[in-house]
Amino acid sequence: MNPSEFLDGGTVSVSDETYAVCRTDRDHPAAFATVREAGETTVVVEEGDLDEVDASDVEPGWKRLTFEMELPFELVGFLAAVATALAEVDVSVFVLSSYATDHVFVAEQALGAAVERLEALGCVVAD
């Protein structure tokens, strides 16, 4: 399997919401994602919910790009292809994966460049 088979013609949705990545010491019930590690918990929340998060550090201003396709576990290099393509246009990424797909977060001010680059790879980007 080649990542380009999934990218070419694959749909990518752009979130209406803007997210913040927060370092905290507990879960948040409305979090899009929670990652627990020894010594810290990271939650990704909509910026409108920031007041409810007791965070020691906050990185606001992230838009979520969701690859609306089921990505098989044996697919090698998909995220590498996406991250490399976005790095070529100087777009930093924050990545989360679910069981079936990937979510790539980009800074709000870099969204236009990210969308253009994904479209150049053959993705259909939907708002």
Name every feature range the model reports, one short phrase each.
Residues R26, A100-T101, A110-L111:
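Short acidic/polar capping segments at secondary-structure boundaries
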Residues V76-S98, Q109:
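A structural feature that tracks compact, well-ordered secondary-structure segments
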Residues K63, V89-S92, D102, L121:
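Generic beta-strand structural signal
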Residues T41-V45, A100-A107:
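A generic structural motif
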Residues M1-A85, R117, L121-D127:
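Regulatory modules associated with amino-acid/nitrogen control
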Residues E47-L50, A107-G112:
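Helix N-cap motif at beta-to-alpha junctions
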Residues R36-A38, L96-A100:
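Short glycine-enriched loop/turn motifs at secondary-structure junctions
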Residues T66, F94, F105:
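Conserved beta-strand segments that form the floor/walls of ligand-binding pockets within enzyme
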